[in-house]
């Protein structure tokens, strides 16, 4: 167990929408604003909805057309770089109180803070320290925050997600006893961290609808239904979580992969899809070279247009030897694409993944690859990386990037698939 640990989980309320309100001089808690790209169709997803709209029943991740027509609101195009700048400034606020070793950033708008060793220093309770940090964030950036306080990471997160939003000061505390008292009978289970609809459906089929019922269920039945994941489910039902921030920071995954995915702006024909996949492969190659890595396995998933009910095309290929050469990898990717994709079907979604990634020190050459050609490829890629880092991602382009159906130039101006605003 965690002994006497105490954590804060701080969330920036409707972060993207709040930033846009602050930039316009509006109160983030009262303004009606959604963050969505007006250049896309009404089916585009709202990246954020301001708290005032949420109170009127507008869900956070709705599509634009789902917002009731009778509700007036302003739309702000996403500016991802601006949000990153605000998040960095708020991280600086955390560092005024807590060392970076005790901070775990969960997402751009949420972070866990291990405040165990700081309460005596500041002569405060965890709730008091949480309030102080929230106020500092508000004073520094005008962004409102909420805070969960808990005796482990799970309880801090649940206190934030389920309880803090009902408190006038947007802060709530949970320990194991309080959790069982307040939330054991809470419904729906999807309100709890890491409990998805599929899990709830399987639990419901077993006659289980609350955390209390999970806690008292026969463990053998839970393990039969959920396998090793039952251990996490049982721990969380009792309000237990043994993992600490130090454990998270010390964790190193056994396997590394590089992935790129995009939803195309329209239905793409077969040959147009080849172009986009090769662009994606080329950019992933640069990522490999930049980090001194090579890959030995490629996976590709193609989602077709909704015009026809085709199942997604999925395939993979293993390379004869690991490489980061764009010439070799683009050839493999194109062969894989032509092997799995229907020539007459329209394409809408593409996901490309390089797996079996290792450091280039382990690279071996086979009888069919030319070491000198590969080294020449990698040197050219390193030069391209250097130019892009100095002059911008569109400073050096290939002929294929200039074709009408290409997406690289536009995507280079995005962060996370959305406009950077720069």
Please give the residue ranges for each predicted region.
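Catalytic palm subdomain of template-directed nucleic-acid polymerases
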Residues: 113-134, 163, 207
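Short, conserved phosphate-binding/catalytic loop or strand-edge motifs used
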Residues: 108-114, 151-156
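Acidic, metal-coordinating catalytic segment for phosphate/diphosphate chemistry
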Residues: 19, 315, 319-422
